[in-house]
């Protein structure tokens, strides 16, 4: 696992028309969560109740949409952590992942100078995307 950070002065920020902040789209969010759970088995996957708690405490959810349907997301927590990046496999590519991260970064950069994330060792694709838009690796750490 690696700790990565991004400073707004180093970031490649953008605004994609396919990215928006969550606005009470609970039914569509549940649909994509259900799809996620059929293709990925992950113990830390959140559900609607967790999403409601996170949003209530001030965390933000940014959505990737295609054909007016949620097809991906990234959470940005009040701790300045970017977390839970996901793009539906049908739409998974560097551009869509980059758009999610850079659009969320653009929005939070208005209030924050720096933000961070963890990237798992197996997720080299996420690291390539993040590095390509200005994120820097701070430290690698491993379980063993």
Give names to the regions the model predicted.
Residues 108-120:
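Conserved GNAT acetyl-CoA-binding A-motif
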Residues 121-139:
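Conserved active-site alpha-helix within GNAT-family acetyltransferase domains
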Residues 92-93, 122:
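Glycine-/small-residue-rich active-site loops that bind phosphorylated ligands and cofactors
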Residues 42-89:
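A conserved beta-strand-loop-helix scaffold within acyl/acetyltransferase catalytic domains
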Residues 79, 112, 138-143:
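Catalytic phosphate/metal-binding cores of nucleic-acid and nucleotide-processing enzymes, i.e., regions
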Residues 1-23, 127, 139-144:
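Acyl-donor-binding surface of acyltransferase catalytic domains
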Residues 87, 93-106, 127-128, 132:
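Conserved acetyl-CoA-binding loop-helix of GNAT-fold acetyltransferases
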Residues 12-46:
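Short amphipathic alpha-helix that is part of the acyltransferase structural core
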